[in-house]
Protein backbone atom coordinates (compact mmCIF):
# COMPACT_ATOMS: atom_id res chain seq x y z
CA UNK A 1 0.00 0.00 0.00
CA UNK A 2 3.01 2.33 0.16
CA UNK A 3 2.68 3.62 -3.39
CA UNK A 4 -1.11 3.82 -3.23
CA UNK A 5 -1.59 5.40 0.18
CA UNK A 6 1.83 6.05 1.73
CA UNK A 7 1.32 3.53 4.55
CA UNK A 8 3.46 0.60 5.59
CA UNK A 9 1.90 -2.83 5.01
CA UNK A 10 2.74 -6.50 5.59
CA UNK A 11 4.66 -8.14 2.78
CA UNK A 12 7.28 -10.69 1.79
CA UNK A 13 8.74 -8.62 -1.03
CA UNK A 14 11.81 -6.64 -0.07
CA UNK A 15 11.49 -2.96 -1.00
CA UNK A 16 7.73 -3.05 -1.56
CA UNK A 17 5.27 -1.69 1.03
CA UNK A 18 7.95 -1.18 3.66
CA UNK A 19 7.65 2.60 3.76
CA UNK A 20 9.94 3.19 0.79
CA UNK A 21 8.51 5.13 -2.12
CA UNK A 22 11.02 5.58 -4.97
CA UNK A 23 11.88 9.18 -5.74
CA UNK A 24 10.74 8.79 -9.33
CA UNK A 25 7.24 7.91 -8.06
CA UNK A 26 7.20 10.86 -5.67
CA UNK A 27 8.21 13.26 -8.45
CA UNK A 28 5.87 11.90 -11.10
CA UNK A 29 2.89 10.48 -9.17
CA UNK A 30 0.44 12.53 -11.27
CA UNK A 31 1.63 10.71 -14.40
CA UNK A 32 0.61 7.26 -13.12
CA UNK A 33 -2.37 5.85 -14.96
CA UNK A 34 -2.65 2.70 -12.90
CA UNK A 35 -1.09 0.83 -9.99
CA UNK A 36 -1.31 -2.95 -10.12
CA UNK A 37 -1.31 -4.75 -6.80
CA UNK A 38 0.23 -8.19 -6.35
CA UNK A 39 -0.05 -10.29 -3.20
CA UNK A 40 3.21 -11.49 -1.64
CA UNK A 41 2.22 -15.16 -1.88
CA UNK A 42 1.47 -14.74 -5.61
CA UNK A 43 4.85 -13.10 -6.16
CA UNK A 44 6.72 -15.90 -4.37
CA UNK A 45 4.79 -18.54 -6.33
CA UNK A 46 5.64 -16.75 -9.59
CA UNK A 47 9.31 -16.49 -8.53
CA UNK A 48 9.33 -20.28 -8.16
CA UNK A 49 7.56 -20.78 -11.50
CA UNK A 50 10.07 -18.54 -13.30
CA UNK A 51 12.91 -20.66 -11.88
CA UNK A 52 11.33 -24.03 -12.63
CA UNK A 53 9.87 -23.29 -16.05
CA UNK A 54 12.27 -20.72 -17.48
CA UNK A 55 15.49 -21.16 -15.48
CA UNK A 56 15.32 -17.56 -14.26
CA UNK A 57 16.89 -17.29 -10.81
CA UNK A 58 15.13 -14.17 -9.54
CA UNK A 59 13.55 -12.92 -6.33
CA UNK A 60 9.93 -12.27 -5.39
CA UNK A 61 9.88 -8.69 -6.67
CA UNK A 62 10.58 -10.09 -10.13
CA UNK A 63 7.69 -12.49 -9.60
CA UNK A 64 5.54 -9.45 -8.82
CA UNK A 65 6.80 -7.71 -11.98
CA UNK A 66 5.82 -10.71 -14.09
CA UNK A 67 2.35 -10.94 -12.60
CA UNK A 68 1.79 -7.20 -13.03
CA UNK A 69 2.95 -7.36 -16.66
CA UNK A 70 0.57 -10.26 -17.30
CA UNK A 71 -2.34 -8.40 -15.65
CA UNK A 72 -1.54 -5.26 -17.66
CA UNK A 73 -1.51 -7.24 -20.91
CA UNK A 74 -4.83 -8.92 -20.12
CA UNK A 75 -6.61 -5.77 -18.90
CA UNK A 76 -5.65 -3.64 -21.86
CA UNK A 77 -5.63 -6.32 -24.56
CA UNK A 78 -2.09 -5.48 -25.65
CA UNK A 79 0.25 -7.94 -27.27
CA UNK A 80 3.61 -7.04 -25.72
CA UNK A 81 4.62 -5.74 -22.29
CA UNK A 82 8.23 -5.14 -21.23
CA UNK A 83 9.37 -5.40 -17.63
CA UNK A 84 12.74 -5.69 -15.91
CA UNK A 85 13.72 -8.28 -13.33
CA UNK A 86 15.93 -6.27 -10.99
CA UNK A 87 16.69 -8.80 -8.27
CA UNK A 88 18.61 -12.04 -7.97
CA UNK A 89 17.46 -15.27 -6.40
CA UNK A 90 20.61 -15.95 -4.36
CA UNK A 91 19.14 -14.31 -1.24
CA UNK A 92 16.23 -16.72 -1.40
CA UNK A 93 18.03 -20.09 -1.39
CA UNK A 94 16.50 -21.80 1.60
CA UNK A 95 13.51 -23.97 2.36
CA UNK A 96 11.30 -21.01 3.28
CA UNK A 97 11.48 -19.50 -0.21
CA UNK A 98 11.90 -22.64 -2.28
Question: Where do the language-model regions lie?
Answer:
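Phosphate-binding loop/pocket of nucleotide- and phosphate-handling active sites
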Residues: 10, 18-19, 23-25, 67-98
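Active-site/ligand-binding loops adjacent to catalytic centers
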Residues: 1-60, 96-98
Amino acid sequence: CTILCGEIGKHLIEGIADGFVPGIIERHRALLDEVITVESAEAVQEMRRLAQKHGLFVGPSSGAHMIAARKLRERHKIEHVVTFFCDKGEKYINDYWL
